[in-house]
Amino acid sequence: MHNFTDMRDENSHDEIWLVEHYPVFTQGQAGKAEHILMPGDIPVVQSDRGGQVTYHGPGQQVMYVLLNLKRRKLGVRDLVTLLEQTVVNTLAEIGIEAHPRADAPGVYVGEKKICSLGLRIRRGCSFHGLALNVNMDLSPFLRINPCGYAGMEMAKITQWKEDATTDNIAPRLLANILALLNNPPYEYIAA
């Protein structure tokens, strides 16, 4: 992701990467040590993205957005709104009503956070992205103050849609972001 961003030029195509991570806490640039309560056996990795601490693990769909914002005429706030709307639209397709919050970036179902965001912009290009909780173990979130909020309750899609997996959510997520970016049809290739 860093190498791609460092090496790209005005003619480089944008890319969207869909991945799952092994268990890890990532601490953003604004991260404060007091928000990491009991990491235990889960490693803590410093990240150059914005935001505080979050957890990544199996069953969570991470989407890295490697976009040339200058070329797309998008500001940072525009990108945050676009990512939040991507998740809202994806969840609406499977019958889950979700919403962003002005006071805490991300996407929520009721008061529970289901998706976290963290971005970095370098030379007008974005990297990092979002993490959507699909069918993961949420208990590691109890070891941190998610996104710097003590007591933040986290959620996952399978609380409302039992058959959800990253395999059936990833293509929907990709289709929704491409629609909002006004991109042409795409081919989804699972690695």
Swiss-Prot record:
One of its GO terms (cellular component) is cytoplasm. Its EC number is 2.3.1.181. Residues 10-185 form the BPL/LPL catalytic domain. It is found in: Cytoplasm. Substrate binds at residues 49-56, 116-118, 129-131. The active site is at 147 (acyl-thioester intermediate). The record marks 113 as: Lowers pKa of active site Cys. NCBIfam families: lipB (TIGR00214), PRK14342.1 (NF010922). Catalyzes the transfer of endogenously produced octanoic acid from octanoyl-acyl-carrier-protein onto the lipoyl domains of lipoate-dependent enzymes. Lipoyl-ACP can also act as a substrate although octanoyl-ACP is likely to be the physiological substrate. This is Octanoyltransferase.
